[in-house]
């Protein structure tokens, strides 16, 4: 069967779920055609805000319910998000992100903070076996990029605006 989620979001799920065994198996394809990423905001609200953009591509989902495997190349357009901890809202160049079992691979994706004289790029991997156990292994290169944009109301210990140029390595769990 094919169904649409939230009206015109253009997400079609096709395939089979075999629940005639003790561990149901999946053999599905999620077809996204300019799927509105704001749909996922509720799932990542602890880390990201203002999630936006469109996703297009096919995501193959297979395996048992306790061991789900997925893979696909997803084209991202007009992607943007706010890092809640830093208060900075970034927009990203259109790109293709490769997804496979627990990994999203970023390959030199351009990033901007909304000002005309800033730019950067990000490469690496985001690990997410489950949404509650995300991790990152990223390299971010910045040229006058905003890194912090908070007020004392946001964080009493440290706040303000910080702009930076250089290379930032981030590795570890997101919590």
Label the model's feature ranges:
Residues 1-58, 66-167, 173-175:
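Interface amphipathic segments
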